[in-house]
UniProtKB/Swiss-Prot annotation:
GO terms for molecular function: small ribosomal subunit rRNA binding; structural constituent of ribosome. Binds together with bS18 to 16S ribosomal RNA. This is Small ribosomal subunit protein bS6. The keyword Ribonucleoprotein applies. GO terms for biological process: translation. The gene is rpsF. One of its GO terms (cellular component) is cytoplasm. Keywords: Ribonucleoprotein, Ribosomal protein, RNA-binding, rRNA-binding.
Amino acid sequence: MTQLYETMYIIRPDLGEETVDQVINQYQSLLRDQGAEDVQTQHRGKRRLAYEIRKFREGIYVQMNYKAAGPLVANLQRAMRLSDEVIRYLTICQDEPDTDVEAATA
């Protein structure tokens, strides 16, 4: 059964633009190759962190929204945990959006 997920991850700020694009494409490909649907990626850019993580005060934020099964999400998180480029990640399961908007507003 597929669920709607959102994964936000932070990439090291000292990486070049080309390397950042490779990292983003790597995780998009991982999701698509394993059967994820509706993979949408938003590159949020470099931002200051609230606190220091692995001696970095800034990070490059990337957000991915997708539909996938639970085991696929576990594989994605494992890949991020083992990666040197990703300094932090968080995945949340989202509720399906209401398809009947009129019933919700009535």
